[in-house]
From Swiss-Prot:
Family: Belongs to the IPP isomerase type 1 family.
Molecular function as annotated in GO: isopentenyl-diphosphate delta-isomerase activity; metal ion binding
Cofactor binding mode and count: Binds 1 Mg(2+) ion per subunit. The magnesium ion binds only when substrate is bound.
GO CC terms in record: cytoplasm
Domain of life (superkingdom): Bacteria
Functional description taken from the UniProt entry: Catalyzes the 1,3-allylic rearrangement of the homoallylic substrate isopentenyl (IPP) to its highly electrophilic allylic isomer, dimethylallyl diphosphate (DMAPP).
The species this protein was found in: Dinoroseobacter shibae (strain DSM 16493 / NCIMB 14021 / DFL 12)
Name this protein carries in UniProt: Isopentenyl-diphosphate Delta-isomerase
EC number: 5.3.3.2
Lineage: Bacteria, Pseudomonadati, Pseudomonadota, Alphaproteobacteria, Rhodobacterales
GO biological process terms on file: chlorophyll biosynthetic process; dimethylallyl diphosphate biosynthetic process; isopentenyl diphosphate biosynthetic process; photosynthesis
Location in the cell: Cytoplasm
Amino acid sequence: MKDLVPAWIDGALRPVGKLEAHQRGLRHKAVSVFVMRGPETLIQRRALDKYHTPGLWANTCCTHPLWDESPADCAVRRLREELGITGLYPAHRDRIEYRADVGNGLIEHEVVDLFIAEAPANLKVAPNPEEVAEVKWVDLYELNAQVKRRPERYTPWLRIYLAEHSERIFGTVATS
């Protein structure tokens, strides 16, 4: 059931096409991963041909589990597919819900399983150009300051995570 994500319709979880979920603003499952290196987090700039939020900076990895996939398996799979990261098994941190307009008539209404992992010193990152335009490591406090200065450069969900859920994700408040 590739490209079918778990979404709630009339109170029941059903497989729905990812684009349809965004067009209809359906509440659906998602996964977000933050890979850390001490006080820094790895962020990605989304590929320019993504159908929503192209070219914007996001957390390490943000995606939707397949219909029959666990959030933990999804996190590992998408780290590999988007960033070429293998051998890293992020820990489940929390679950949050948000709703955001992502442009072009599309809505993200996600119930997100949040994962976090500490990068080993020898972590190799090889971004898939179909998914990721570039990556960089950035200090969490500096990232928060950058998001406040230029919010239009960042995805709505990253802005929400930092502003409203920092302590739940990182165990600290990401303030500048």
